[in-house]
Amino acid sequence: MNILNLKIIMFLLISNTIVVGGAWATSTCPDWPATRIAVEINALEQQLNKWSAAYHQQGHSPVTDDIYDQLQDKLRVWQSCRGLPDKTESQPIPGKGQFLHPVAHTGLKKLKDETALTRWMAGRKNLWVQPKVDGVAVTLVYHGGKLVQLLSRGNGVKGQNWTEKAPFISAIPQYIANAPALLTLQGELFLLMDGHQQAKSGGVNARSTVAGALMRKSPSPLLAQVGVFIWAWPDGPTTMKEKVALLQVMGFPFTAKYSEPVMSHLDVVQWRQFWFQAPLPFVTDGVVVRQEEEPAGRYWQATPGQWSMAWKYPPLQHIAEVKDIHFTLGRTGKGTVVLEVLPIKIDDKWIRRVNIGSVTRWKQWDIAPGDHITLALAGHGIPRLDNVVWRVHQRNTITAPNWDKFHQLSCFQRLPHGCEPQFLSRLIWLSGPGGLDIGGIGGGFWQELIHHELINDLVGWLLLTPEQIASIPGIGNARAEKIYQQFQRAKQQPFSRWLLALGFPQVVSVDAQWQVVLRRSLSEWATMAGIGQMRAKQIKHFLDHPDVQALADFLSTQKVVGFELTE
């Protein structure tokens, strides 16, 4: 394979996968008519604009940066599906304000991953990395060394006047000796923290806290806990080394302390990981890589510049798109709803399905195909639904099946009609770790037996011959013989495991026998440790059920441990 073909294949692989700060998600075009995708693009774009305006005008947003960035990535995918240009990076920063910035705030374009970082750094020199401080962006304007304006970022061109709050922020020098006649600085007002570790504590709502204090009409005591990190000095010294040294002399020490020269992408990777774990005096959400060489301030615009880039930390919340909704019937007759999502990789685990519980819970969530949800990994790596962050505009009606006739003692057989889902769930439980723990036997195998009508009740598999098992497509003679031997050995499993495999509501002692269990009265069960009156009734209903007794009779003929007839 030549190099050109290899590059093409790599491009195709990359173009069909998006990386969102450590979470991998497939990026396929939705199977929608052109009219619908246009409607959905417009709806998502409007919502993102509203959130962005709230962020820049009020210092907070109804959604986290993680969610916003991932939904913005989704918008790009949808736009590319229609051949529309990506306008997300060139759009003006939304916001409001009446006071003109001497130099526009450019904002930052975000790098998706290490590959994008390497590509951007190629051919550039004199690069530095800084923590991306999570706070409120401002402009500081000094005339003759005196602070004359403190402006919010606003829309990048105009901002609000917060100058009256500046005297209450001790981190902002009110006068700088030997300063240039006109000095314009851009930076971040942040909440001073004591050894904040981003990897452990996250954002702790620090930005909103600072924004709230700045927007109050009367000065807030919280302003005394606000620091400032200067990240831009338009038309300042040409080298970063001189720039940070002068900033420190002028009373802005954080820039010098947290600016590091980098030679390669590996240096950036190391600093990013270090600052993610290290105790810091501020909240961060990534790193910023910037080059010394930058245009004169008069050329800056309120759109991301090309001389600095942000590389954010892995998201704490991961978005998945709901592809379909499946209704499953468990072995006890309880229905559950499983969301099928476009595959997303969280940490080292690929997520494709998420169990969200009962139909009632699903209705409360109001989830439809196309909706976007946030997922997290709970105990044992099981995916958990956290929230619905975006609902599609066009919602297809989905009707849940009626499961009223199913219960704890229904469907020990494949028939009657409608029993197959619960029957399959019983078989999966029977062969699983909670039952007989038959290695390598799961839902796929049982489904094939049902499909080929080789099994009609919960224990009918004990009668199967190697030849019958081998008749299933994909199972050869050798594997069929192995499965047959596993089934025969299952007869020697402890009686207590057999009871659990059949669906018995409570563990009993291993040395019990079916006849002994059957003769116990309701009151005897109720007085046993850990059972009680309610569970005792469930046990008696189970033991007295004709289908269960038929299964026990069959197991007796098969000489299964504990079910043999005693004289």
Curated annotation (Swiss-Prot):
Q: In which domain of life is the source organism classified? A: Bacteria
Q: Does the keyword NAD apply?
A: yes
Active-site residues per Swiss-Prot or TrEMBL entry: K132 (n6-amp-lysine intermediate)
Q: What is its EC number?
A: 6.5.1.2
Instruction: Enumerate the InterPro entries for this protein.
Output: DNA_ligase_B, DNAligase_adenylation, DNAligase_N, NA-bd_OB-fold, NAD_dep_DNA_ligaseB, NAD_DNA_ligase_OB, RuvA_2-like
Catalysed reaction, written as an equation: NAD(+) + (deoxyribonucleotide)n-3'-hydroxyl + 5'-phospho-(deoxyribonucleotide)m = (deoxyribonucleotide)n+m + AMP + beta-nicotinamide D-nucleotide
Disulfide-bonded cysteine pairs: these are none
- Per the UniProt record, one Pfam family is DNA_ligase_aden
Can you cite a GO biological process for this protein?
DNA repair
State one molecular function term (GO). Answer: DNA ligase (NAD+) activity
**What keywords were assigned to this record?**
DNA damage, DNA repair, DNA replication, Ligase, NAD
Q: Which HAMAP family match?
A: DNA_ligase_B
By sequence similarity, the record places it as follows:
Belongs to the NAD-dependent DNA ligase family. LigB subfamily.
What this chain does, per the entry, is described as:
Catalyzes the formation of phosphodiester linkages between 5'-phosphoryl and 3'-hydroxyl groups in double-stranded DNA using NAD as a coenzyme and as the energy source for the reaction.
PANTHER family tied to this protein? DNA LIGASE, DNA LIGASE B
What's the protein called, per UniProt?
DNA ligase B
Query: Which species is listed as the source?
Result: Yersinia pestis
